[in-house]
Amino acid sequence: MKVRASVKKMCDKCRVIRRHGRVMVICENPKHKQRQG
């Protein structure tokens, strides 16, 4: 899980979602998981 100021899709499989007021990226590739913070 990467914590970043700006989250971006890193590939076509990445999905940008909102959970508990946080913007997150979920993906098949675990390296692409990101959370805004």
Curated annotation (Swiss-Prot):
GO terms for molecular function: structural constituent of ribosome. Keywords: Ribonucleoprotein, Ribosomal protein. SUPFAM superfamilies: Ribosomal protein L36 (SSF57840). GO terms for cellular component: cytoplasm; ribonucleoprotein complex; ribosome. Pfam families: Ribosomal_L36. It comes from the Bacteria. InterPro entries: Ribosomal_bL36, Ribosomal_bL36_sp. GO terms for biological process: translation. PROSITE patterns: RIBOSOMAL_L36. Belongs to the bacterial ribosomal protein bL36 family. NCBIfam families: rpmJ_bact (TIGR01022). This is Large ribosomal subunit protein bL36. The gene is rpmJ.
